[in-house]
């Protein structure tokens, strides 16, 4: 719920305790309660929509909020921030030169998504991932979509994340993407849109679970007894899903979570998920391949591994096949994978499906593979490999968000209105030299 007119490139939870007073036109305690005089400024409000009254699903939450003063909200918010720091709930921003480890932002006013809205979002994400899986099965198989001109062949076969090693290699249940991070934003008009897909090694779910736990501890009187769908069983659900892709004949599979190690930006999440699933957290040096089978080194000897939930990018996964200088992967892992002796989630080669240029074709792929209309729309996207897309981007670069197509996690993104003239000039030079490597999108004015 934001009243600011500042444009944003991606949704960010409000920093704990910041700007609480500025959200409201009147001091707490005056007639009408805490939200008296609140002005949405023409933006969709997650609590009140475009009206000055609580949305049906938020009536009870707003009533409870009226029982808090600004001072009490700030006090609890600050306490929550300290607890996040104590628990180590942080993430790393490598491009931030001043502060590498950052605390997870915590908003004292929770976003409420009514059940009927959530069901539509859920259906839209399922539809999207189904199309992406069909697309991956196709491009690593008969390549019908390329032959039918649904998507340019050079965009796929020339993609840095296309893995020829996956050609004609079957995967369990035809599923390449088992865990997908779909970035969804709601604009000032109240409409949800997909900003991008993350189908390689997406992270962030641990922060959702921890945020919920902290909200329940910091504001028990705010959320107690509200009909909220649980998120604490995510680890159990993930372990069950991973068990289903174990090699044939394995009834009680050994699952491990493969991490690059403590210096990875999402290492907190790796620890969290391994603990929640009840599986070993391993690094490449903890695994070995013998006779095309994967084993884990233990004090009792070698133990067979059947499913690897990997949080390691393709390039570093197996030095025999990908980067030979990788010290993070497992030599011979792809041999075991090809033989069907171990399952990987997500599968190798999924990066081509979440490429930001391919993103622009996802609605078309949904229609092609599923014969359905997209449930959730894309954000307007300009493909710089196309002359009109390049011209549009160069002419308006200072007002657009420019993204490298093959990166993930926000790396290399240039937010036109927020960078210096020097940084914008450097980005323009890179774009002009290699337009096929970029797409652009408008700044999204968020709810």
Where are these regions (language model features)?
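Preference for protein termini
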Residues: 1-447
């Amino acid at each position: 719920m934001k009243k600011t007119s500042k444009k944003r490139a991606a949704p960010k939870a409000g920093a704990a305790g910041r700007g609480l007073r500025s959200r409201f036109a009147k001091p707490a305690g005056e007639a009408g309660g805490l939200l008296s005089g609140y002005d949405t400024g023409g933006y969709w409000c997650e609590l009140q929509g475009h009206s000055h009254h609580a949305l049906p699903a938020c009536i009870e939450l707003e009533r409870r909020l009226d029982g808090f003063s600004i001072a009490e909200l700030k006090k609890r918010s600050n306490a929550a921030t300290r607890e996040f720091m104590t628990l180590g709930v942080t993430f790393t921003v490598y491009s931030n030169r001043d502060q590498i480890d950052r605390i997870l932002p915590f908003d004292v006013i929770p976003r409420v998504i009514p059940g009927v809205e959530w069901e539509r979002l859920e259906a839209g994400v399922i539809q999207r991932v189904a199309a992406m899986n069909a697309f991956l099965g196709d491009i690593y198989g008969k390549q019908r979509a390329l032959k039918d001109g649904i998507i340019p062949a050079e965009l796929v076969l020339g993609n840095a994340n296309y893995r020829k090693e996956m050609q004609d290699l079957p995967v369990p249940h035809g599923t390449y993407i088992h865990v997908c991070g779909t970035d969804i934003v709601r604009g000032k008009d109240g409409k949800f849109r997909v900003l991008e897909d993350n189908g390689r090694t997406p992270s962030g779910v641990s922060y959702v679970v921890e945020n919920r736990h902290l909200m329940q501890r910091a504001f028990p009187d705010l959320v107690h007894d509200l009909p909220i769908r649980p998120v604490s069983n995510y680890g159990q659900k993930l372990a069950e899903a991973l068990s289903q892709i174990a090699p044939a004949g394995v009834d009680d599979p050994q699952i491990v979570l493969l991490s690059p190690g403590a210096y990875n930006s999402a290492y907190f999440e790796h620890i969290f998920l391994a603990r929640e699933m009840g599986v070993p957290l391993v690094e490449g040096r903890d695994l070995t391949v013998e006779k095309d089978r994967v084993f884990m080194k233990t004090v009792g000897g070698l133990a067979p591994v059947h499913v690897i939930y990997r949080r390691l990018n393709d390039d570093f996964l197996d030095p025999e096949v990908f980067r030979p200088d990788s010290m993070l992967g497992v030599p011979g892992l792809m041999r075991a994978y090809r033989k069907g002796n171990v399952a990987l989630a997500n599968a190798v080669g999924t990066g081509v499906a979440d490429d930001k240029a391919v993103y622009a074709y996802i609605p078309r792929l949904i229609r092609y593979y599923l014969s359905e209309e997209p449930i959730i729309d894309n954000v307007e996207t300009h493909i710089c490999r196309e002359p009109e897309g390049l011209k549009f981007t160069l002419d308006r670069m200072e007002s657009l968000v420019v993204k490298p197509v093959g990166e993930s996690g926000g790396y290399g993104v240039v937010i036109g209105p927020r960078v210096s003239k020097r940084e914008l000039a450097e980005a323009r030079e890179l774009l002009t030299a290699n337009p096929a490597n970029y797409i652009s999108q408008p700044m999204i004015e968020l709810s």
